[in-house]
Regions:
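Extracellular/lumenal N-termini and interhelical loops of multi-pass eukaryotic membrane proteins
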Residues: 1-34, 267, 271-273
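Alpha-helical multi-pass membrane domain signature
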Residues: 33-306
Length: 306
């Protein structure tokens, strides 16, 4: 489930939405049929990704507690906020997947549906925020020029995340009681996807500028073993950055597609095909997991800022 692909469906037939004023506005599979069609793949998807996100949360908390101050000594706040956001995202995703995955239960309470939908959206915001803060740490640590200075600071990213989360809460609550206000959900989904796409592109731009700076500094590398070793370390970091950029760009492009396509609030379909849903959501969960993994890898490979 993503923040833009859930639906509360009680019946298994094609009854009208009007009987269920609190139903979700986005199309989803007919869960009674979908679970039978997907079989063991449904179970593997739910419990597999629940375990992955639980590990992401556990690793984030463990790293905060056991490794604080080990790296990025001048940017402990950045580091703590980034890993805290990952911990929240991993925890919320795993809870929702284990409790009521994609709001697929036929006997879900209204409060449970609303909690799951909002929690999933908050997790999406936290993953995107962590992805952004990791880029900020890299840009500041390597002193790479990238965009206006007032946009390259932790308070700005935290404020942006909180604004997105508050708008998410507002839009979900309004649409919950007034489904005709679905444009609010649409704006929320497009904003999240666009934010992620911009950050993904910035990873590539920052990486390209770091590479340019590295090549400029390698003129005398053969005179300095230390410089040569540092250049190799930076090359590995750049490779990770480009992979993170690629996976992020694909993920947020898929998110944008689902927001404006047949998975979105303006789709004319009520139900979508089980296998179409499974492919899209499995792809997104995989890419989100890889983004988190690459954040951790970049943390270990990034240069110290002493």
């Amino acid at each position: 489930m993503t923040a833009n692909k859930t639906k509360y469906i009680i019946p298994s037939n094609e009854t009208s939405y009007s009987k269920y004023p609190n139903s979700r506005v986005e199309p989803s599979p007919n869960w009674l049929i979908a679970k039978r069609e997907l079989g063991w793949l449904w179970v593997a998807h739910v419990y597999g990704f629940a375990a992955i996100f639980a590990l992401i949360a556990t690793f984030s908390v463990t790293f905060i507690v056991c490794k604080r101050g080990a790296i990025f000594k001048k940017r402990k706040a950045h580091f703590a906020v980034m890993l805290s956001a990952l911990a929240v995202a991993g925890f919320l995703r795993s809870v929702v997947l284990l409790w009521n995955p994609y709001v697929s239960s036929n006997n879900s309470l209204d409060s449970q549906v609303l909690f799951c939908v909002i929690s999933w959206g908050i997790a999406t915001a936290c993953i995107t925020s962590s992805f952004s803060i990791m880029l900020l740490i890299l840009v500041e640590t390597t002193k790479t020029s990238l965009g206006p200075e007032r946009l390259k600071n932790l308070p700005f990213l935290i404020t942006m995340t909180l604004v997105n989360v508050l708008y998410l809460l507002l839009s979900e609550l309004v649409v919950w009681f007034h489904p005709e206000a679905q444009v609010m959900i649409f704006i929320c989904h497009v904003a999240f996807a666009s934010w992620g796409l911009v950050v993904s592109i910035c990873y590539s731009v920052a990486g390209a500028r770091m590479w340019r700076n590295l090549k400029a500094s390698l003129g005398g590398a053969f005179f300095s073993r230390t410089l040569y070793q540092e250049s190799n370390s930076l090359k590995r970091l750049l490779i990770l950055m480009f992979f993170a950029s690629s996976f992020g760009a694909i993920n947020f492009t898929v998110s944008l597609y689902t927001a404006i396509g047949e998975f979105g609030v303006y789709s004319e379909k009520r139900y979508i095909k089980s296998w179409d849903w499974f492919i899209v959501h499995s792809t997104q969960r995989t890419l989100e997991s890889l983004q988190c993994i690459f954040i951790f890898l970049i943390v270990f490979k990034a240069p110290n800022d002493d």
